[in-house]
UniProtKB/Swiss-Prot annotation:
PANTHER family, sorted: ADENOSINE DEAMINASE
Keywords: Hydrolase, Metal-binding, Nucleotide metabolism, Zinc
UniProt GO cellular component terms: cytosol
Cofactor mode of binding and number, as noted: Binds 1 zinc ion per subunit.
GO molecular function, one term: 2'-deoxyadenosine deaminase activity
Purpose of the protein: Catalyzes the hydrolytic deamination of adenosine and 2-deoxyadenosine.
The reaction(s) this protein catalyses: adenosine + H2O + H(+) = inosine + NH4(+); 2'-deoxyadenosine + H2O + H(+) = 2'-deoxyinosine + NH4(+)
Pfam family, one: A_deaminase
Protein known as: Adenosine deaminase
Amino acid sequence: MINTSIPLVDLHRHLDGNVRVNTIWELGHQHGIALPADSLETLAPFVQIQGKETSLVAFLKKLDWMVAVLADLDAVKRIAYENVADAALSGLDYAELRFSPYYMAMNHKLPIEGVVEAVIDGVKAGLKDYQVNINLIGIMSRSFGQPACTQELEGLLAHKQHLVAMDLAGDELGFPGELFNEHFKRVRDAGLAITAHAGEAAGSQSMWQAIQELGATRIGHGVNAIHDPKLMEYLAKHRIGIESCPTSNLHTSTVSSYAEHPFRTFMDAGVLIGLNTDDPGVSAIDIKHEYRIAKFELGLSDAELAQVQRNGVEMAFLSESERKALYAAKA
């Protein structure tokens, strides 16, 4: 099912959406934070999906617990380290870990730039102990508004040499992408690549805006592109990567069933699309789970799954020499 001669990658993976249940438990007790359960076993349903959640709101409530325990920068460093460990232990050759420093900082009023530094330090420590390739993507969380995103951007750009790209995440209906055109001009001027969550809660126009105005060369989720034939044609022609996260889309009710997921439609249209975990800690999944879903629920053949693996490597924010090195390591 997974082709061992092709690098296995996960490009849409939120660092702040992958905090271990036992880490939430330990940090909560260490810092005197009231948790919603009185044992490790009973905590899991509050922070991980049990079956299918009914809405994005229910999903996000679980996600919020993952940052609620980030009481100091050591906690941030710990979860960054554990993210590297989890990526390696799940069999990934390469992962891009994205994180929103404002979201991670807000509960305990941590310094935004300090959060960025702690993430970088935690990842560096993890890379010393685990055999995996990792790059970082900074997120601007638009749900908190333009001024918050400016703070977030400045904290991230202060360490731009440790980032490969910037992302726009959050409420795309309430905070459309055009509110952040100036933010992304600064991102482009800094020489970073751009991806954006779009076409998930909003329609295809959100994706057009992300590509044409923000400068996105990849789109997170993008499920609503299938309703716009011109956009589908554009995506295929210009090799705009779709970071697809089928299980997450089901858990947030972006799609009502795997049968309704548009992954196959993208494949048949020749769109560059890859499989990703999104918030693996919340969904309680790993990348191999997504490949099983793609085979047994979405109906992809082993040859098509191999193409999806290759797509992921092509979409990755890597230089050609780095891409070749990933393949060489599998030879």
